[in-house]
Amino acid sequence: VWVMVGSLVDLAGKAGLGKAGPSGALSRLAGLPRSVFGTFLGHFGIGLTTLGIVVVSIFGTETVLSMKPGEKTGLAGYELAFDGLTPVEGPNFTELQGAFHLSDSSGQNFATLISSKRTYSARGMPTTEAGIETIGASQVYVSLGDKGPDGSIVVRIWWKPLVTLIWLGAVLMVIGAVF
């Protein structure tokens, strides 16, 4: 956070904010060399990326549980419900799709996640496609595991708060490098 604040303070200082008044600061800001903006964006991007990494590392969660259709689990103030499994035949694979829906604290559904486990017929190699939902700057990932004899399936759920800041920061660093 201090890198981002420092970048903002540095840019405001170079623009003369507080000395020249708002209109004078804007005209000074417009007259600054492009490299000043590149430096600002690069350092601000480093701060965003670092913030995203730290928050995900400290507050991110991973839950592994067995779920049957109709079962629900809590997730960072939301509720994730397992709707069921659907077999799908593709041109060169068979797939088991799991449907999940997310609801907020009032019970209102706002997202459907589809996760799947594929097996390709040529090699018999299984792969997993995660269901992903972005909520603000955070993301939920849902991945399917093995199916149980009782109709349940192992589900792995990740909550990654502020994970998109990692990518946003990287984009700002790239834009800053172009300046």
Across the structure, where does each feature detected by a protein language model lie?
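Solvent-exposed, non-transmembrane regions of integral membrane proteins
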Residues: 1-179
